[in-house]
From Swiss-Prot:
InterPro entries, per database record: Aminotransferase_I/II_large, HisP_aminotrans, PyrdxlP-dep_Trfase, PyrdxlP-dep_Trfase_major, PyrdxlP-dep_Trfase_small
Keyword entries, A-Z: Amino-acid biosynthesis, Aminotransferase, Histidine biosynthesis, Pyridoxal phosphate, Transferase
Quaternary state and interactors: Homodimer.
Family according to the record: Belongs to the class-II pyridoxal-phosphate-dependent aminotransferase family. Histidinol-phosphate aminotransferase subfamily.
UniProt protein name: Histidinol-phosphate aminotransferase 2
Pfam family, one: Aminotran_1_2
Length: 357
């Protein structure tokens, strides 16, 4: 049946939604895939061992609804208590619960105009008023733009897709000016060059920090994310979770995430490799005439003064190299967001760009 003949059964909310568009997951082999910010090095061997250990009769049983062992490990890692940790199916689910539990108020929630594009989707889904605050000319967040009364603030740090980092001192200034509304720092990429805001949680009851194991822990396929905040904020998230899905993390996700959190040496080693490759990639791109924004993430955001971003992405694809291009907002249409892959993948990209530029 056509969409026209079936959409009459939709709710008004669904009809008005503009859903999030995920990055492409191509089925073709032998591609240089640099479009969705996955970690190129794979999870810790301990993760694979833990996953194998979950194969058995216990799969007939429901998993721990509260992920107690995983929450305890995350709490130990961040030097907080387990009741300050919430876990979910990727940070996207954690963020969705956060919007409903903590950011749905009469006043609008503020976030940057160039940022993670799921934020306005959540607002549309839950009927949350929002205001997109323009980044400055250097694509940076200006804290002074977030000081007016509001229903909350959320932004990634480093920001996505720009990769730019807001210093902790500026975050503290933002918190000082927003004592009566929740401030959410989305730290999906912070392990690649930023300082976490988690230590600020002890002094700021309105602060919630969300994180994911998809990027720095190379576990995008398991879907594990979490939030750290003072206990009342975590209780609010749990109330939403238990009204939606009381068993969000399956046995494999809990076991794999626990093993990854506990293997700190492996985690630190792959982050260091990504950071080193990023430095090489930035130098190579700049030598080809690209402007590359300063990045504290596992991707770079770059444009060439003589080449259209969309056309360049298409020509790279013809050479079996996939990067991410955003048509909107128009201000970032000249840019390409390029995941930092292995040295070999990035060398292949640079060689292709030498031929194209």
């Amino acid at each position: 049946m056509s969409r026209t003949s079936t959409s009459r059964y939709w709710s008004a909310v669904v009809g008005a939604l503009t859903p999030y568009v995920p990055g492409e997951q191509p089925k073709l082999a032998n591609l240089v895939k640099l479009n969705t910010n996955e970690n190129p090095y794979g999870p810790s061997p301990r993760v694979l061992e833990a996953l194998r250990g979950e194969v058995g009769d216990t799969l007939r049983l429901y998993p721990d609804p509260n992920s107690d062992r995983l929450r305890a490990a995350i709490a130990a890692y961040h030097a907080v208590s387990p009741d300050q940790v919430f876990v979910g199916n990727g940070s996207d689910e954690v963020l969705a619960h956060t919007f409903l539990a903590l950011l749905k108020h009469e006043r609008p929630v503020f976030f940057p105009d160039i940022t993670y594009s799921f934020y306005p989707v959540y607002c549309g889904l839950y009927g949350i008023a929002h205001r997109a605050i323009p980044l400055d000319d250097a694509f940076e967040i200006r804290v002074d733009d977030y000081l007016a009364p509001k229903g909350g603030v959320i932004f990634p740090n480093p920001n996505a897709p720009t990769g730019r980092l807001l210093a902790l001192g500026e975050i503290e200034r933002l918190l000082a000016a927003n004592r009566d509304s929740v401030v959410v720092i989305d730290e999906a990429y912070v392990d690649f060059g930023g300082d976490s805001a988690v230590p600020l949680v002890a002094r700021h009851p309105q602060l919630l920090v969300t994180r994911t194991l998809s990027k720095s822990h190379a576990l995008a396929g398991l879907r594990v994310g979490y939030a750290v905040g003072q206990a009342p904020l975590i209780e609010a998230l749990n109330r939403v979770k238990d009204s939606f899905n009381s068993y969000p993390l399956d046995r494999f996700a809990q076991a794999g995430a626990l093993a990854s959190i506990e293997d700190r040496a492996y985690f630190e080693s792959i982050c260091a490799r990504v950071i080193a490759t990023r430095t090489r990639l930035v130098d190579a791109m700049e030598s080809l005439g690209f402007e590359v924004l300063p990045s504290a993430a596992n991707f770079i955001f770059a444009r060439h003064p003589a080449h259209d971003g969309e056309a360049l992405a298409a020509r790279l694809r013809e050479r079996s190299i996939i990067v991410r291009h955003f048509k909107n907002p128009a201000r970032i249409a000249p840019f390409l967001r390029i995941t930092v892959g292995t040295d070999a993948q990035c060398d292949a990209l640079v060689d292709a760009l030498k031929a194209l530029c």
